[in-house]
Amino acid sequence: MGERRDTTVIVGAGHAGTAAAFFLREFGYHGRVLLLSAETQHPYQRPPLSKEYLLAQHSTPSLLKGKDSYARADIELCLQDDVLSITPASRQVKSSQGSYTYDHLILATGSHPRFMATLGQADNLCYLSDWDDAGRIRQQLGEASRIVVLGGGFIGLEIASSACKMGKHVTVIERAPRLLSRVVSEAFATFIGDIHLGNGIELRLGEEVREVRRCTSGVRVDAVFLSDGQLLECDMLVIGVGSEPRMELATAAGLACASGVLVDEHCHTSDPFISAIGDCVAVCPSPGHQLPRRESVQNATEQARLVAARLSGRPVPPVQTPWFWSDQLQARINLAGERPAQGQVIVRRYGGDKVSMLYLQDQQLVAIEACNMPGDCLLARRAIGQNHSLDLARLVDADVPLKDALHFA
């Protein structure tokens, strides 16, 4: 009789879960790897859903891995296999297709859009979470001419950008007094907002949708009432007001949860045989010190690599500088590092729609916000956290290449 193989079950086949499966093999893990997905599609890239796909540049999902890659890597991909419950005491997962016993479980359940129950449902009221949602939005965009987007974060602005490129009249409504209030500085948000305004997108900041008006049949929204009483007619309403972690399974299993599934810096949950990664987690490196959830492909990949290395007995890789990107209209936005609450800001203006905002603390570069300057962001990522020497006099001069100001050869 052959020796029993360890089994790692991964719940969720988004960026984090799929990356974890392949990193396990890359790091020499010889156990059984099961990757469970409730979706019908092979694991696919999420970022294009709010951009290229809506513009009909993609008719099928951009897959994370080729369909035959899973069998070649000895990864058991189980599609349309919705996990129903987890029983930590017996280390069992019950799903719509059966049950699995695990030696280690990785939760990569992701997040879902924050729903606005007060607005109800309608055929042309849309949220974006997955491939099916994107298909519905694309269909509605093809029929609509006046689009209202509720939410001035990245998802809302990316969808607004796609609609604008299609020649639609777009209004973005944001309850905060500025765009991107949770993720970028006010100055950078203003810069990005000006690009949207310059392309004809209407921005209604400091406003909320109080209620919707429906057509006679009641199945479609034809207008929204704002908090100031104004009525905006529309053919389509897209809601992008943030996300919530999918942690129902974790909560029901008795795992510690708060604003996400709580994990330490090595992605251990409160159960020693369960890890959690990606958009569903909130890192709590020490008691009472919970970090904000990070929702990005880079973070999902880094956490997947970390857990796979740990389960494979490999050295845990060093933490990388966090980074993020977004495409909006003619703007390529790149962010890296952690913007400090206080510190020095250096703005390098290159003219037109190009700018880099560098954030220093104790004479060290700690973050960058860049628009249409991806090279600056790559250089900054190399310098952040490296105790790198800076030439402040040259750093403030946009005519001096950033490479030279950072003393890179």
Curated annotation (Swiss-Prot):
Cross-referenced Pfam families: Pyr_redox_2, Reductase_C
GO molecular function term, any single one: oxidoreductase activity, acting on NAD(P)H
Keyword flag Flavoprotein: yes
Keywords associated with the record: FAD, Flavoprotein, NAD, Oxidoreductase
Flavoprotein recorded as keyword: yes
Named cofactor requirement(s): FAD
EC number of the protein: 1.18.1.-
Broad EC category: oxidoreductase
The protein, known as: Terpredoxin reductase
Its biological purpose: The oxidation of alpha-terpineol by cytochrome p450-TERP requires the participation of a flavoprotein, terpredoxin reductase, and an iron-sulfur protein, terpredoxin, to mediate the transfer of electrons from NADH to P450 for oxygen activation.
Annotated binding of NAD(+), by residue: 151-159
Signal peptide residue numbers: none
Sequence positions that bind FAD: 7-38
GO cellular component: cytoplasm
InterPro entries registered for this protein in UniProt: FAD-oxidoreductase/Apoptosis (IPR050446), FAD/NAD-bd_sf (IPR036188), FAD/NAD-binding_dom (IPR023753), FAD/NAD-linked_Rdtase_dimer_sf (IPR016156), Reductase_C (IPR028202)
Organism: Pseudomonas sp
